[in-house]
């Protein structure tokens, strides 16, 4: 399945929820879902009864789009989560949260996960002192993500770090803004994920 390259705001309207795909725009009145809180398309404002399967599918699509994951990779994450100890749905969210691109976004180095993914791919970071360019890499407690010296003058990164206060940083991460450095203090817990996600619906979908 190819990666979606169309309007990001259209995805938010389709899922009926803010996915925060457009960075700072999502926090302003320009946010599409604040202006038109109904699905896109000719019949977007009509009322359509959705089946249980449809509800489960929409939830899966919503989470997949929040984190920018393709279907095959997302299914792989679910299978990994299902083999782990604990609650499968929560395990899935923890795997997604521990992706390196998500951590870069959570720390405020980028205004969106897509932007963070590009920064990682282009080699702007080091992890524990070594250059890294794999967005899907799973971080662990004690890992240190730092912006490389030559990247610290990139205006977009500096502006994003200045605006991170509005978004907030999860308890399991710590940012040293002056050092352009973030530390993974612990593994995420369910309470750290404040987005309106019903992960059990995804478990039910894949368990059919």
UniProtKB/Swiss-Prot annotation:
Q: Name the CDD domains for this protein.
A: S4
Domain S4 RNA-binding per the UniProt entry, residue ranges: 98-159
Keyword terms of this UniProt record: Ribonucleoprotein, Ribosomal protein, RNA-binding, rRNA-binding
**Family, per the entry?**
Belongs to the universal ribosomal protein uS4 family.
* Biological function: One of the primary rRNA binding proteins, it binds directly to 16S rRNA where it nucleates assembly of the body of the 30S subunit. With S5 and S12 plays an important role in translational accuracy.
The family database entries (NCBIfam families) matched by this protein are listed as: PRK05327.1, rpsD_bact
Quaternary context: Part of the 30S ribosomal subunit. Contacts protein S5. The interaction surface between S4 and S5 is involved in control of translational fidelity.
According to UniProt, the name of this protein is: Small ribosomal subunit protein uS4
Biological source species: Geobacter sp. (strain M21)
Gene that this polypeptide is encoded by: rpsD
């Amino acid at each position: 399945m190819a990666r979606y390259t169309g309007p990001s705001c259209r995805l938010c309207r389709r899922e009926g929820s803010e996915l925060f795909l457009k960075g700072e725009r999502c926090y302003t009145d320009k946010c599409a879902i604040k202006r038109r809180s109904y699905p896109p398309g000719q019949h977007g404002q009509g009322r359509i009864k959705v089946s249980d399967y449809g509800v489960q599918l929409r939830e899966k699509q919503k989470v997949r789009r929040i984190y920018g994951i393709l279907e095959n990779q997302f299914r792989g994450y679910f299978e990994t989560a299902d083999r782990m100890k604990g609650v499968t749905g929560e395990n899935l969210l923890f795997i997604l949260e521990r992706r390196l691109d998500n951590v870069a976004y959570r720390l405020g180095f980028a205004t969106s996960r897509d932007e963070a993914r590009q920064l990682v791919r282009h080699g702007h970071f080091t992890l524990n002192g070594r250059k890294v360019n794999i967005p899907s890499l799973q971080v662990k407690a004690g890992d240190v993500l730092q912006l490389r010296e030559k990247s610290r003058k990139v205006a977009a990164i500096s502006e994003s770090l200045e605006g991170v206060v509005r978004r907030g940083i999860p308890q399991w991460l710590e940012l040293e803004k002056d050092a352009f450095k973030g530390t993974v203090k612990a593994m995420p817990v369910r309470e750290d994920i404040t987005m309106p996600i019903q992960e059990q619906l995804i478990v039910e979908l894949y368990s059919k």
